[in-house]
């Protein structure tokens, strides 16, 4: 977990192997961003355990960057135990009649800050069409890009102010993400890579050198 002040902004990156399950908390509200990993049941179990350790039995918000299994596969298991008041989905798929589908940039009040949600649909694969999420409070900024590719990152840099304290490194450290232009724009103090045993070479040395 990381956060300058626990009540203002806290991000917990759960250990789910080659996947991503993130818990964002601010001002007494909790949001799960993605719910996937090397095992659908393990990522759901670890998300439950984290919430229940804080006596939390529901979520204010559930968001997905995209629908690849390593970001989404634990969702059904998770929702059997803990409900979400609001669900936000990227407008790249109609897989779930579950919540609000976002097709344009929008801002959502959350805790003591604002969630800026930036959908993208210019990639060649669904994972490259990831929705980027920037959470900002007065004292903290967190940028999450899912598996967004370099073209999507450059679009973000061109269209938005992206300065953030924490960067969740895109696509588990793949060389096809985390371009120099993005790093120059964000200037993170801390970069976190959610990764586990894999056959893709993640995180690549190229990305580690850029960081």
Residue ranges and their predicted role:
Residues 1-211:
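Non-globular, low-confidence helical/coil segments that flank catalytic cores
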């Amino acid at each position: 977990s990381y956060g300058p002040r626990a009540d203002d902004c806290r991000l917990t990156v759960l250990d789910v192997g080659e996947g991503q399950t993130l818990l964002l908390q601010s001002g007494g509200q909790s949001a799960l961003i993605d719910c996937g990993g090397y095992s659908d049941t393990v990522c759901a179990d670890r998300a439950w355990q984290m919430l229940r350790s804080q006596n939390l039995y529901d979520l204010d918000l559930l968001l997905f960057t995209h629908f690849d299994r390593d970001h989404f596969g634990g969702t059904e298991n998770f929702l059997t135990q803990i409900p979400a008041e609001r669900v936000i989905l990227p407008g790249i798929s109609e897989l779930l009649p579950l919540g609000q589908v976002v097709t344009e940039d929008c801002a959502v009040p959350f805790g003591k800050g604002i969630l800026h949600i930036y959908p993208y649909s210019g990639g060649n694969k669904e994972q490259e069409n990831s929705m980027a999420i920037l959470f900002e409070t007065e004292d903290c900024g967190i940028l999450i890009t899912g598996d967004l590719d370099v073209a999507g990152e450059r679009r973000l840099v061109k269209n938005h102010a992206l300065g953030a304290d924490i960067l969740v490194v895109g696509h588990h450290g793949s060389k096809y993400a985390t371009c120099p232009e993005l790093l120059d724009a964000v200037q993170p103090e801390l970069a976190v890579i959610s990764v586990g045993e894999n056959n893709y070479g993640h995180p690549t040395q190229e990305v580690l050198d850029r960081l």
